[in-house]
């Protein structure tokens, strides 16, 4: 019989009580364990019943204990469990045997069932007593647990208290081998790292390996791209960057995995350059699969890292265990720019991997074959000659001259052919379009590739500068041979002023084209660059806003890397395809003089051309009342020019079309000068208004002591699309931005009644007032007339009425309280 306590325990376990039922012929069915006993009272299969009954016990215990804790107990005796199971079923077997011999009533069957269940419940109770959970490592050593938590959270007070009281040592660990320094490093807790290394009670060892990967704290910091933590380890401790974790990765490998270009540059300068001493890293050191850092950078498609590694001599021909060179791994991402850099660096495009596949077959497997073919063609390889380098028959300088002077020939032919008054309008127009498009196509296919291997090469070629200068040349020729002989004395002042403007825009055009726009000097010694990096780290500014990762030099304020000249330009304004040069601190004044003088020259040329047409009208006896001589939509003098001077008429019309973007460019440049902005800064300001903030690779710790003043930097503009490129070519992109800001100023309001001004939402650090900004742009030094004609010798220019060197400008002059509006 089952006593009262057993019945109460049975009621307290509903899972078992619900699954225990009386079956046919008196069998005991335990559904939870899925075991069955036959009508003869024998267990069908001893091993199966043993397993199934144990399952029933486990299911019972699941309702009262945490299964994980139960399974974790090491003192569970398998033999005792089998004995308990045998005892549990002995009651049931004996009872059913008597049942077969005497055929007792059904109440005896219920008694047997209860006894069997009582045995199972007793087993469960015994197991519960035998499987009490043991305390965890954290519970056994709460002080060490508190230390780890404090390091993760950056609680310096708690860390110093635990270490100074001697409750724990800095190098104490749990069974995983992870130290407090590991947790402080990976959580970017610089003050905690410093304390653990420098305290007088228990100093941490930066070379202890821990965790599943058996990595050092330096490894953990490198894997997460934490520059300031790594710098502290390298400079102030004996942390060894050559140590390897269980995956055979050293500090440089892990830094490449992080894709933080600033950390990679730091390690290259401090450990791989000629300035490194004892902590020397080999740039081509491989892991256990023979993969170098360049292999990993190529696999990740990380262009900045690839360029940095190549700058330090990384070998593009290194092979791993699968005979893959970095180029093969680059096909995993298939980025065109990455493939082009590796191909241009001398990668063997016919190298085969362990499967016998070269770059072409790998490209097919990765669905980037077409991209690879484009890359090879842009790199100057000939598909008709086994992809060998093409033979260049034209010198690059000659190619540039041909591109530049082609419009000098094409434009006059087009203007002369388009004499629509004589008939054949469609054939003449068709011929002109074909001539213009055909010449550009020939230049793009045959001439431009001799000096520029890019897909969109037209904007970066001298073609647009040739179109402008060719137009100006034929305007000057027309003025000299048509207008001056006829109107020299009638319009003497106009001709004199026009000649002055012609001289100004021609001189400023070629001067702005050939002058150095303001290249920031790049140190030739890596030790100088490393010193610049350390200076930036000290003030918490080592990021891509303050360091150029393309040229490896500290970026002065208002500078920007030019993808046209491949150099860092001081006070960068924009790249202008019409002058075939960047506009920077040394040629910005020249560019504005060019735009202003060109604007007025176009107006005067148009004015004098109309006067010439009017003079021709009087001399030719043109009858304005004769309907047959009139022109649709044209005045009488323009009609005469259309019929009698069609070359000059077409040239004037072409100049007026160009005048649209010239006028807008004048307005925008004037507005930006008055606001103390450059074109690039104005574009970046628009992005800030739209909250498109760029990532600058900064890993500055939150607990870093910022003792220097904060610098206002502009974010880079968004990537251009087709429409924005067209707007930039004709100078309307800045107009669009100005209109956007104007619309926001009109329709956007703050929560108050006051009008919202987008330009005032962010402080412009270079805006010192309209008057000061205007004078700063035109004068170098004191405000004297002679100084307006001076051009910067290097990077000097005025800012807030003070001469500054834009090559070394790292702080803005403070604004005065009485800044003019």
From Swiss-Prot:
Q: Give the ANK repeat ranges.
A: 142-172, 176-205, 213-243, 247-277, 289-318, 322-351
Here the segments flagged for biased composition (Basic and acidic residues) are 93-117
Q: How does it sit in the membrane?
A: Multi-pass membrane protein
Annotated signal sequence is none
Segment Disordered: which positions?
A: 1-118
Q: Where is the DHHC domain?
A: 546-596
Q: What catalytic reaction does the record list? A: L-cysteinyl-[protein] + hexadecanoyl-CoA = S-hexadecanoyl-L-cysteinyl-[protein] + CoA
Active-site residues from the entry = 576 (s-palmitoyl cysteine intermediate)
**Protein EC:** 2.3.1.225
Annotated keywords: Acyltransferase, ANK repeat, Endosome, Golgi apparatus, Lipoprotein, Membrane, Palmitate, Repeat, Transferase, Transmembrane, Transmembrane helix
User: What does the entry's domain section say?
Assistant: The DHHC domain is required for palmitoyltransferase activity.
Which family does this protein fall into? Belongs to the DHHC palmitoyltransferase family. AKR/ZDHHC17 subfamily.
Protein name (database record):
Palmitoyltransferase AKR1
Provide the species name: Debaryomyces hansenii (strain ATCC 36239 / CBS 767 / BCRC 21394 / JCM 1990 / NBRC 0083 / IGC 2968) (Yeast)
Gene expressing this chain: AKR1
């Amino acid at each position: 019989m089952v006593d009262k306590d057993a019945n109460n325990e049975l009621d307290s376990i509903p899972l078992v009580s619900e699954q225990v039922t009386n079956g046919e012929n008196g069998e005991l069915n335990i559904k939870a364990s899925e075991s069955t006993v036959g009508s003869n009272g024998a267990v069908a299969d001893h091993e199966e019943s043993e397993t199934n009954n144990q399952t029933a016990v486990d299911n019972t215990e699941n309702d009262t204990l945490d299964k994980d804790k139960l399974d974790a107990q090491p003192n569970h005796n398998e033999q005792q469990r089998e004995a308990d199971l045998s005892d549990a079923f002995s009651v049931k077997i004996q009872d059913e045997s008597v049942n077969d011999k005497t055929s007792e009533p059904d109440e005896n069957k219920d008694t047997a069932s209860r006894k069997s269940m009582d045995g199972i419940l007793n087993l469960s109770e015994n197991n519960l007593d035998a499987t009490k959970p043991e305390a965890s490592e954290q519970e056994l050593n709460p002080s060490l647990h508190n230390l780890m938590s404090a390091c993760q959270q950056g609680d310096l007070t708690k860390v110093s208290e635990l270490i100074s009281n001697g409750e724990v040592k800095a190098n104490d660990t749990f069974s995983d081998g992870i130290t407090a320094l590991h947790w402080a490093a990976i959580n970017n807790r610089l003050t905690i790292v410093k304390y653990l290394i420098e305290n007088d009670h228990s100093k941490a060892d930066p070379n202890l390996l821990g965790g599943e990967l058996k990595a050092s704290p330096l490894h953990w910091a490198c894997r997460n791209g934490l520059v300031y933590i790594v710098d502290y380890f390298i400079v102030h401790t004996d942390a060894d960057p050559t140590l390897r974790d269980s995956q055979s990765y050293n500090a440089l490998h892990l830094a490449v995995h992080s894709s933080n270009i600033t950390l990679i540059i730091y390690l290259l300068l401090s450990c791989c350059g000629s300035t490194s001493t004892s902590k020397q890293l080999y740039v081509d050191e491989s892991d256990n699969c023979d993969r170098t850092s360049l292999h990993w950078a190529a696999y990740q498609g990380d262009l900045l890292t690839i360029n940095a590694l190549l700058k330090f001599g990384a070998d593009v021909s290194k092979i791993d265990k699968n005979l893959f060179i970095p180029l093969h791994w680059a096909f995993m991402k298939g980025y065109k720019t990455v493939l082009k850099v590796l191909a241009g660096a001398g990668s063997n495009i016919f190298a085969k991997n362990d499967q016998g596949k070269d770059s072409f077959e790998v490209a097919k497997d990765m669905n980037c074959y077409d991209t690879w073919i484009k890359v090879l063609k842009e790199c100057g390889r000939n598909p008709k000659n086994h992809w060998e380098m093409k033979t260049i028959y034209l010198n690059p300088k000659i190619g540039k001259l041909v591109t530049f002077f082609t419009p000098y020939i094409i434009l006059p032919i087009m203007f002369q052919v388009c004499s629509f008054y004589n008939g054949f309008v469609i054939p003449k127009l068709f011929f002109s379009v074909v001539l213009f498009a055909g010449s550009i196509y020939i230049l793009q296919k045959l001439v431009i590739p001799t000096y520029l291997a890019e897909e969109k090469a037209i904007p970066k070629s001298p073609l647009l500068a040739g179109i402008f200068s060719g137009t100006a040349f034929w305007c000057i020729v027309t003025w000299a041979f048509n207008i001056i002989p006829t109107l020299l004395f009638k319009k003497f002042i106009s001709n004199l002023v026009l000649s002055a403007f012609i001289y100004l825009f021609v001189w400023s055009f070629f001067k702005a084209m050939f002058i150095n726009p303001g290249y920031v000097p790049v140190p030739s010694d890596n030790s100088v660059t490393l010193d610049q990096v350390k200076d930036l780290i000290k003030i918490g500014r080592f990021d891509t806003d303050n360091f150029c990762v393309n040229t490896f030099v500290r970026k002065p304020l208002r500078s920007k890397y030019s993808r046209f000249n491949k150099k860092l330009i001081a006070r960068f304004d924009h790249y202008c395809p019409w002058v075939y040069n960047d506009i920077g601190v040394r040629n910005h004044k020249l560019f504005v003089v060019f735009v202003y003088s060109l604007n007025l020259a176009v107006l005067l040329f148009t004015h004098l051309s109309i006067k010439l047409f009017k003079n021709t009208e009087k001399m030719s006896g043109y009858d304005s009342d004769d309907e047959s001589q009139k022109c649709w939509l044209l005045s009488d003098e323009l009609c005469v020019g259309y019929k009698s001077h069609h070359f000059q008429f077409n040239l004037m019309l072409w100049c007026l079309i160009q005048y649209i973007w010239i006028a807008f460019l004048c307005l925008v440049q004037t507005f930006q000068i008055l606001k103390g902005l450059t074109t690039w800064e104005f574009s970046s300001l628009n992005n800030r208004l739209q909250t498109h903030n760029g990532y600058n690779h900064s890993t500055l710790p939150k607990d870093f002591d910022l003792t220097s003043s904060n610098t206002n930097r502009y974010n880079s503009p968004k990537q251009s699309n087709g429409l924005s490129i067209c707007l930039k070519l004709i100078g309307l992109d800045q107009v669009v931005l100005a209109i956007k800001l104007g619309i926001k100023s009109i329709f956007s309001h703050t929560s108050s009644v006051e009008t919202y001004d987008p330009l005032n939402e962010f402080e412009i650090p270079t805006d010192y007032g309209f008057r000061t900004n205007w004078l700063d742009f035109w004068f170098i030094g004191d405000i004297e007339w002679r100084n307006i004609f001076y051009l910067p010798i290097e990077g000097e220019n005025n800012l807030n009425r003070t001469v500054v060197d834009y090559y070394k400008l790292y702080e803005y002059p403070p604004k005065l309280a009485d800044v003019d509006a």
